């Protein structure tokens, strides 16, 4: 994803792990308005500056808005994907046709569901915690905050992510072994061909 200048691809998959919520949302909102399709994965690991207790109290005050007919059915969802989606919506003129179409180009997920687990994932340097948050400053994860205010799937997502990482490690080890065998085969072939490679070198074969 190219921030602020042009469309990089048909669809960009962004790994949101350890990105700052507001900074990532502002960059994504700008890209959506430029026509870019964006998929956000691992939204439960987005960071918010400030300690967990402070953020929980702020969010609970925000969640006090309820329906009169059914108080448990408030207008605000507590899942990390919905919190990020709502943050981006606040940065887009979503009541216009342009804003409505821009918001439709955004997909947000907890964890990394198929088929995005096998696709190349990008990061946004301008929103990374390690570059944007001062050293020693408190922060909390969006998944932790959501689990404190009513989201029930934090442990489920962590378990699914653990299984996905185990599968990825098996694939990586297999690929590394195949690369070793390929390098060894190339060395054996070079030793066998020897002088023939010197003849083929001038014609760039």
Curated annotation (Swiss-Prot):
GO terms for cellular component: cytosolic large ribosomal subunit. One of its GO terms (molecular function) is mRNA binding. One of its GO terms (biological process) is negative regulation of translation. Keywords: Ribonucleoprotein, Ribosomal protein. HAMAP family: Ribosomal_uL13. Belongs to the universal ribosomal protein uL13 family. NCBIfam families: L13_A_E (TIGR01077). This is Large ribosomal subunit protein uL13. The lineage of its organism: Eukaryota, Viridiplantae, Streptophyta, Embryophyta, Tracheophyta. The gene is RPL13A.
């Amino acid at each position: 994803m190219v921030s602020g200048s042009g469309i990089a691809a048909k669809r960009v998959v962004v790994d949101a792990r350890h990105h700052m919520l507001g900074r990532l949302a502002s960059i994504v909102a700008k890209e959506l308005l430029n026509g870019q399709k964006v998929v956000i994965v691992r939204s439960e690991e987005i960071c918010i500056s400030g300690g967990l207790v402070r953020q929980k109290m702020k969010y609970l005050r925000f969640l006090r808005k309820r329906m009169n007919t059914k108080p448990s059915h408030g207008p605000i969802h507590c899942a990390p994907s919905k919190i990020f989606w709502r943050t981006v919506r606040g940065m887009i003129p979503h009541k216009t046709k342009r804003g409505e179409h821009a918001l439709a180009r955004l997909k947000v997920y907890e964890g990394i569901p198929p088929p995005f687990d096998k696709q190349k994932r990008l990061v946004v340097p301008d929103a990374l915690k390690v570059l944007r948050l001062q050293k020693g400053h408190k922060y909390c994860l969006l998944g932790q905050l959501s689990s404190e205010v009513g989201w029930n799937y934090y442990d489920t997502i962590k378990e699914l992510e653990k299984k996905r990482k185990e599968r990825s490690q098996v694939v990586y080890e297999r690929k590394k072994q195949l690369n070793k065998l390929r390098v060894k085969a190339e060395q054996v072939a070079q030793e066998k061909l020897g002088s023939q490679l010197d003849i083929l070198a001038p014609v760039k074969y």
